[in-house]
């Protein structure tokens, strides 16, 4: 079963997909959203679920460094509730502390990417890292 990884922010959602075996994750795209206007990009997610044959979701859960949940983690959980209501597919969460920092480091140090280009791909790369970390630990969706 392919899993869709999502890095949910206040303005964008980075999207990644696993291979059918649950071994690797690759970035797909970045969906523009507007939390304030309650535009969450769910219709585009629906198109991608169908197009990519996703059977479940893994969302990044941005915990605080002391392991507590703050406003961004609550927003991610709310997004998970929206996905569950719309798709009736399993949703699980992966601790995403520092994944965006890691993505930024990879783009600067390893790919020597310009700041303008980084802004265009960082959320997609973060979604890939979140999903890959999940796959490396679990190999499959644990919340079925």
Curated annotation (Swiss-Prot):
An example molecular function term from Gene Ontology annotations: nuclease activity
Main location group: cytoplasm
Subcellular location as annotated: Cytoplasm
EC number, UniProt record: 3.1.-.-
Domain of life: Bacteria
CDD domains from the UniProt entry: YqgF
Gene Ontology biological process terms, A to Z: rRNA 5'-end processing
Pfam families named among the record's database cross-references: RuvX (PF03652)
Gene Ontology cellular-component terms listed: cytosol
Entry's family note: Belongs to the YqgF nuclease family.
Protein name, per record: Putative pre-16S rRNA nuclease
Organism: Lactiplantibacillus plantarum (strain ATCC BAA-793 / NCIMB 8826 / WCFS1) (Lactobacillus plantarum)
